Every structure is written in structure tokens, then in C-alpha cells.
């Protein structure tokens, strides 16, 4: 029986998940888990990429010890961050995190040289201050001159494992430098940030085979035989592939550190409404586009849990939140102040004081403020999607860690007036594995793969609670409009 391994690394943790098809169902095992996080070093928030690679090998050793002698492997991580590689094939610095404050005003600075309209028309990508375009705009110019290749994080990991350098196109689209329709880097934008297309490896689609690990690794670690496949390397792209897609007019919410809400299209949408609402057209796998908005996610809850010294589990925090009345305060969760504050609890409380609202004090009140306002923000975005697409979204498929937060899922269903299907929580790893299975010929296509997902995992169904919170979305929208002036 073939074994497939998903290396799935997020901003706060990583894991190696092993998947196999048994009697038409996908069985998953977590083989290794490890922490992740940036650290302040040499004046910037940076990722320890060498540590992440070492953890991958530790996981592969566990897989070998468990009796798996030959596996397929795919890698996905968060988007936008990159590694600068010199002519000797080594990294020039530890990669800087998208949460680093160096790009806080970069959109305003760069768009004095090239218009927002040009950038959006060319790339179709949402304006976010941490996009690769703005990171490179702030990059050390002397370092860029020494750079032979600019590699996105998962491409760099694949390069270290196999010695083969590629640029996977779905993740490349998140840079805000890839032309929307041609699928090539836009030379005008590259020039504005002092790089050239030669500094990127060949663009490839998900499903491209990189091949075996470098022989050197087998002398250092006890490893199975590994065949590396380039999957949809942005974790959200993999998560969408791993979404069951219930409903006729469906949308998805990949709910993790970030929330990514949108729908899947065959043709990109970069018209006036999409530009006004700052929606993105990221490339997906197999000729699709992920039309979505990247907004705040469970990062706020993760910070609060940490600031409470991890004395509560996430399920315990959700229980405490359930004892509190929702919508006691309105919060624009997408405000930049919540991206990387010194203390999230204090930042939420300060926001409520500044806006003249009830200040949450207890852990339950703070968590309810987060969950209820995330639900409001999701509902608000669904109403925008309705307007842009010209039809009512009737179903929201929630995948990722947030699919386990029943309280938030029910609030979202009720406020947005949509059916919510929650799960699987491991959609990213599942989508990663599904691309590998399609590449190997074990699954015919994504459509059949999604049917396998529906049959293999417990998907919870939430329906709107009629008559509850009927005015709260309109009130929240008024609050946001007033705040934005």
C-alpha cells in the first residue's frame, strides 16, 4: 500500500502527516509534530529555517522506524516569505517573517512609483503590507545584488532536500508580482524592487515531480526512500484542494492562524468591485483561481492562549467563551494593530476603551470578543462575495483548526445566513496528499478526490438559528464604515 507524507508547516507549528487509501477511504496518521515561530534576530523577526528542515528529517526517521521504507512527500507552508540564496547555493540570511514591521508603510511608498490600479490589474492580488513585493522593496539592496535565486519557503525546503530549484506557481502568485493571466513575473514590478526574473527558478505547476532526496542525507539520517512531489505549496492552496465543497454556491474558509475566505473560479475576477473590496486571485491547482480575502484568523486566540501562560487549552477557552454573551463589543479584527502587538489582550482592551465600548476582562470575555467578531467579519465578507459574484453564497465550508470551534461556526452560520460544513481540520495536509495521489495515478482528479474526503472524515453541519442576532451584522457594518471614515 502506497504511503504519502504531507510536510505541513504553519506559522505556529508543523507536522508530518502520513496518508494511505484503504477501501476507498483516506486514512491519516500524524507521525511528527513540532513548534514553529519567528524570533527577533539581527534587527528583524526571522524564521529558523534550518531548524524546520532538521525537524522534517526527524519526522522521516520516525516514519522509517514505523516500517515505511518508501514514501512520496509534498511540502506546504505559509506564503509570501522567501529565502535569498547565493551563487554557492547557500542562504544569505535567515528569512525575515511577514510579521516583521519593516513593511508597515511599504504599500504607500511603492505606490508613489507605480499605481495600485496597475498592480491590481496585472496581478489581481489583494493589497497586504507583507506581500513579497513590499518585502523585496524593503530588502537590503546589496544583499539582492549577491542573490542568485529568490526562493519561496517551501521551494527552498524542496531545494535543500533534492538539490532541484523550482518556483511553484500557486505560491508565486501570492508575491503580487506574477501576471494574472500569463503566469509570468511582471518585469515592471520586478524592476521597482530591484530584482529580475532570472533570480527566480523555473515556474512549475502543482504535481511536478522533483525526485529523490540527495544521497548526502542518507549518510546523516536513517531515512526511507523519498520521492518529492511539488504540491500546491501555499498551505491555503492545499487546504482548498482538501475542502469537500458541499453546496451549489459554495465558499470556503480556511481557518487557522489566518482566515482565508473565498470561492474557487475557473476565470479570475479582477474588476472594479473586486479591486474596491481588495479581493485576491491566487492561482490554485489544475487551472483554478482562489478568489479570496486574507483576513485575521486564530492568531488573536493563539496570542491570548500564550499570554495566559498556556494554562487553558483551546477547547477550555472556547468553553469559557460559551458562558459569555456575544457581541458585547465590535472589533475590526483586520486592523493592523492586531498583526503583531506586544500584548494581544492589552491591545484588545485598549481598542475597546478607545472606541467607547465594554472592555473584556476575563479569559472568557476576551475569547468571546475574538470569536464573535471573527464570525461577524466572516459574515461581512460573505455579503461582499454575494455582491461581487452576483449570487448568494448558500454554503460555507470551514476547514483547518477553526473548524473545531463549534461556537464560532454556529455564530457564523446564523449571522451570515448560510449552511456551514465544518471539517476536516487537517484539510491542508489532505490537499497536499491528494495532489501526490493524483500525480501517482491513485486518484483520477480533484473532483473524485473531494468525494473521497467527504466519505473519509467527519464533517459537522451547522444551520442558521432563525430569528437570532438579526440586526447585528448591519450594526457591525455601520461600525466598520464609521471607523474607516
Residue ranges and their predicted role:
Residues 1-93, 146, 218-228, 416-418, ...:
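N-terminal glycine/serine-rich phosphate-binding loop of ATP-dependent small-molecule kinases
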Residues 6, 18, 111-123, 137-152, ...:
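Active-site core segments that coordinate phosphate-bearing ligands/cofactors
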Residues 41, 61-97, 126-130, 158-179, ...:
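Short beta-strand-loop/turn "lid" adjacent to the catalytic site in phosphate-handling enzymes
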Residues 51-64, 182-188, 377-384:
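Short, well-ordered amphipathic alpha-helical segments that serve as non-catalytic structural scaffolds
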Residues 69-77, 149, 202, 391-400:
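Short glycine-rich phosphate-binding loop at a beta-alpha junction
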Residues 76-81, 206, 255-258, 395-403:
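Glycine-rich beta-strand-to-loop/alpha-helix junction loops that act as flexible
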Residues 100:
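Carbohydrate-associated surface elements
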Residues 131-137:
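A charged, well-structured terminal subsegment
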Amino acid at each position: 500500500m502506497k504511503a504519502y507524507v504531507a510536510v505541513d508547516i504553519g506559522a505556529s507549528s508543523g507536522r508530518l502527516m502520513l496518508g494511505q487509501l484503504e477501501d476507498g477511504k483516506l486514512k491519516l496518521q500524524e507521525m511528527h509534530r513540532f513548534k514553529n515561530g519567528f524570533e527577533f534576530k539581527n534587527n528583524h523577526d526571522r524564521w529558523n529555517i534550518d531548524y524546520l528542515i532538521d525537524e522534517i528529517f526527524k519526522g522521516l526517521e520516525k516514519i522509517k522506524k514505523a516500517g515505511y521504507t518508501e514514501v512520496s512527500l509534498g511540502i506546504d507552508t505559509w506564503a509570501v516569505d522567501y529565502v535569498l540564496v547565493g551563487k554557492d547555493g547557500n542562504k544569505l540570511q535567515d528569512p525575515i517573517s511577514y510579521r516583521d514591521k519593516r513593511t508597515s508603510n511599504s504599500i504607500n511608498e511603492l505606490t508613489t512609483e507605480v499605481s495600485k490600479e496597475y498592480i491590481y490589474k496585472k496581478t489581481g492580488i489583494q493589497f497586504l503590507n507583507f506581500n513579497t513585493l513590499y518585502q523585496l522593496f524593503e530588502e537590503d539592496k546589496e544583499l539582492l545584488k549577491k542573490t542568485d535565486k529568490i526562493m519561496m519557503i517551501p521551494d527552498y525546503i524542496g531545494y535543500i532536500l533534492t538539490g532541484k530549484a523550482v518556483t511553484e506557481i500557486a505560491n508565486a502568485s501570492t508575491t503580487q508580482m506574477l501576471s494574472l493571466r500569463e503566469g509570468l513575473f511582471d518585469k515592471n514590478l520586478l524592476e521597482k524592487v530591484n530584482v529580475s526574473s532570472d533570480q527566480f527558478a523555473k515556474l512549475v505547476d502543482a504535481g511536478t515531480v522533483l525526485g529523490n532526496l540527495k544521497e548526502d542525507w542518507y549518510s546523516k539520517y536513517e531515512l526511507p526512500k523519498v520521492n518529492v512531489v511539488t504540491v500546491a505549496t501555499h498551505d491555503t492552496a492545499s487546504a482548498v484542494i482538501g475542502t469537500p465543497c458541499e453546496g451549489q454556491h459554495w465558499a470556503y474558509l480556511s481557518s487557522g492562524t489566518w482566515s482565508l475566505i473565498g470561492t474557487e473560479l475557473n476565470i479570475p475576477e479582477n474588476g472594479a468591485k473586486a479591486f474596491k473590496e481588495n479581493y485576491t486571485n491566487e492561482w490554485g491547482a489544475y487551472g483554478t483561481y482562489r478568489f479570496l480575502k486574507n483576513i485575521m484568523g486564530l492568531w488573536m486566540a493563539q496570542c491570548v492562549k500564550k499570554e495566559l501562560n498556556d494554562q487553558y487549552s483551546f477547547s477550555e477557552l472556547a468553553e469559557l467563551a460559551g458562558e459569555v454573551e456575544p457581541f458585547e463589543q465590535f472589533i475590526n479584527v483586520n486592523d493592523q494593530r492586531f498583526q503583531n502587538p506586544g500584548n494581544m489582550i492589552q491591545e484588545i482592551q485598549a481598542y475597546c476603551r478607545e472606541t467607547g465600548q465594554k472592555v473584556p476582562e476575563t479569559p472568557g470575555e476576551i475569547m468571546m470578543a475574538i470569536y464573535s467578531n471573527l464570525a461577524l467579519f466572516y459574515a461581512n465578507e460573505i455579503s461582499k462575495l454575494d455582491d461581487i459574484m452576483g449570487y448568494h453564497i448558500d454554503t460555507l465550508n470551514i476547514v483547518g483548526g477553526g473548524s473545531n470551534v463549534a461556537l464560532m461556526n454556529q455564530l457564523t452560520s446564523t449571522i451570515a445566513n448560510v449552511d456551514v460544513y465544518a471539517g476536516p481540520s487537517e484539510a491542508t495536509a489532505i490537499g497536499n496528499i491528494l495532489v501526490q495521489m493524483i500525480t501517482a495515478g491513485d486518484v483520477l482528479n480533484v473532483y473524485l478526490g473531494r468525494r473521497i474526503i467527504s466519505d473519509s472524515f467527519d464533517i459537522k453541519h451547522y444551520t442558521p438559528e432563525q430569528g437570532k442576532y438579526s440586526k447585528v451584522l448591519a450594526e457591525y457594518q455601520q461600525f466598520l464604515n464609521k471607523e474607516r471614515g
